């Protein structure tokens, strides 16, 4: 009976956490989403802890990345199981360690979680930085401001800390331990006060002595159906759609116009007439146009962001972080049979963190920016390197049309918001079917393309926004990278040594100390 109850609790946690990443803006659920499965750990063995957290992981990931079935059913199942294994390993590690003092649990468990999130992100080939726990708070601006110091990892730590503290409070109430209750409550309160005080301080505007350079940017959302992409019969329709939207945006006198990923319907170098139309439009509106296009060089093909002006191509960036099994086949030289299972063309890897330069009207000072293509904005290291290279603002061009009317575009937006906060830079998004918007350095979505009903995906349009480029010092996180993860790794290593002896004892987690 207890095991059956534990399974229901594990499923409940998976559902709560998945809803926190849904399109329904339920991020608050992440503050206590782990509580049911944590409570189910009472009197469980290592094997059962592994099993319970595996269930939570499967439910969470199935409910979070269900939209991948529009691309691959088998791949979705494999990925769900792989990602759920991180949950299972998490349960395995923390189960014996919960026998330690409650104060250690409050520090240890969040540290383990952050370390596993980081490993999931950087793991070779299978690195997947989607749905980090901290992303769920993208609408709660005071909570996420700490990301400019710790990265998103600090937000994830805070959420896990809150979950563990709530469990401590529940056990203290059940066992009538006033001291335990006070300790957990006070620590949670102090942690929240510290983070929220910093958050409110950062989001309140303050006078600055830095030189501001207003730059007007227009983002285009073509809303081209995925089945139209790369259909030669649709090329003129696609190009005409973007040309017409750009012409409409010209009334706002933008300094830069941004098209989505792969908006250019042909390989750039193979169809000069299409490139000429873009150059003519750039000349007409007197502003450069950043287009997403497939480019080729020396027999290789790249997924690129290309800056075009009346004179021609000014510069380009080739995507660095490609999508495995979507843009290339990992290990195909070692396992050649994969090419027959996944028959896709290879997109070559870029190797340069390119920075584009534009000159806003009425301003002889250059403004620099960098582009993140597709899911590159979910990897903090890429944005950080662009910021270090001198980018004054960031751009994300993407095509999420693959995933239909699902939560995928909203989850993708979550990552963009945290990238803006981490680097304290404006971020402009141009997405084929949405969500196209502008995000300011504190993570606020200041404007978005939407229809009259407020729908943001699968609508056609453009949006122009003036951003103020501020020449300020790089954020602490930008300068010192993932230092917070290193601290969590050290805490994990140190505290793992202590409970090894506890493996011989079946003591309950969070058990009251013996008097």
Positions of predicted regions on the chain:
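Membrane-embedded alpha-helical bundles of multi-pass enzymes
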Residues: 2-205, 405, 419, 431-433, ...
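Cysteine/selenocysteine-centered motifs that mediate thiol-based redox chemistry or coordinate metal-sulfur cofactors
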Residues: 341-362, 366-368, 372-373, 468-503
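Short, conserved active-site loops that position catalytic residues or coordinate cofactors/metal ions
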Residues: 21-36, 221-222, 253-266, 397-400
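CN hydrolase (nitrilase-like) catalytic-core segments centered on the catalytic cysteine
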Residues: 83, 110, 256, 263-264, ...
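A short, polar/charged loop-to-alpha-helix boundary motif
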Residues: 319, 323-335, 452-470
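Soluble catalytic regions of membrane-associated enzymes that act on cell-envelope
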Residues: 199-328, 345, 355-365, 371-377, ...
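Short polybasic linear motifs
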Residues: 208, 212, 502-507, 511-512
């Amino acid at each position: 009976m207890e095991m059956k109850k534990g399974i229901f609790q594990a499923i409940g946690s998976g559902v709560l956490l998945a809803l926190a990443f849904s399109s329904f803006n339920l991020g608050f659920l992440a503050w206590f989403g782990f509580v049911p499965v944590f409570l189910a750990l009472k009197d469980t063995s290592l094997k059962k802890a592994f099993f319970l957290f595996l269930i939570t992981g499967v439910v969470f990931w199935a409910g979070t990345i269900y939209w991948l079935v529009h691309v691959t059913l088998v791949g979705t199942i494999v990925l769900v199981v792989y990602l759920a294994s991180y949950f299972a390993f998490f349960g395995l590690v923390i189960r014996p360690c919960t026998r330690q003092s409650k104060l250690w649990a409050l520090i240890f468990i969040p540290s383990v979680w952050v370390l596993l999130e980081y490993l999931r992100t950087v793991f070779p080939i299978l690195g997947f930085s989607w749905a980090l726990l901290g992303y769920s708070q993208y609408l709660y601006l005071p909570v996420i401001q700490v990301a400019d110091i710790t990265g998103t990892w600090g937000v994830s730590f805070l959420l896990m800390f809150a979950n563990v503290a709530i469990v401590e409070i529940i056990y203290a109430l059940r066992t009538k331990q006033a001291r335990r209750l006070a300790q957990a409550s006070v620590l949670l309160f102090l942690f929240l006060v510290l983070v929220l005080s910093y958050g409110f301080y950062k989001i309140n505007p303050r006078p600055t002595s830095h030189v501001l350079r207003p730059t007007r940017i227009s983002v285009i959302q073509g809303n081209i159906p995925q089945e139209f992409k790369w259909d030669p019969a649709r090329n003129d329709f696609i190009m005409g759609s973007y040309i017409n939207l750009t012409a409409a945006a010209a009334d706002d006198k933008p300094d830069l116009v941004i098209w989505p990923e792969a908006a250019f319907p042909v390989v750039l170098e193979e169809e000069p007439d299409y490139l000429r139309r873009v150059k003519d439009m750039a000349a007409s509106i007197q502003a450069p146009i950043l287009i997403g296009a497939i480019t080729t060089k020396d027999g290789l093909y790249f997924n690129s962001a290309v800056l075009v002006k009346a004179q021609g191509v000014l510069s380009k960036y080739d995507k660095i972080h490609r999508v495995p099994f979507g843009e290339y086949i990992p290990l195909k030289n070692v396992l050649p049979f994969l090419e027959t299972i996944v028959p896709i063309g290879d997109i070559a890897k870029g190797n340069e963190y390119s920075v584009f330069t534009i000159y806003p009207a009425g301003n002889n000072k250059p403004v620099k920016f960098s582009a993140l293509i597709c899911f590159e904005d979910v990897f903090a290291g890429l944005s950080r390197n662009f910021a270090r290279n001198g980018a004054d603002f960031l751009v994300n061009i993407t095509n999420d049309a693959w995933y239909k009317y699902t939560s995928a575009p909203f989850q993708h937006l979550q990552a963009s918001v945290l990238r803006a906060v981490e680097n304290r830079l404006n971020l402009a998004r141009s997405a084929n079917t949405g969500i196209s918007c502008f995000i300011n350095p504190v993570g606020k979505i200041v404007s978005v393309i939407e229809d009259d009903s407020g729908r943001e995906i699968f609508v056609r349009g453009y949006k122009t926004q003036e951003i103020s480029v501020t020449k300020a010092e790089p954020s602490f996180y930008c300068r010192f990278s993932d230092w917070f993860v290193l601290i969590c790794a050290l805490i994990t290593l140190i505290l793992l040594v202590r409970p090894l002896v506890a493996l011989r004892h079946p003591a309950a987690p969070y058990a009251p100390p013996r008097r």
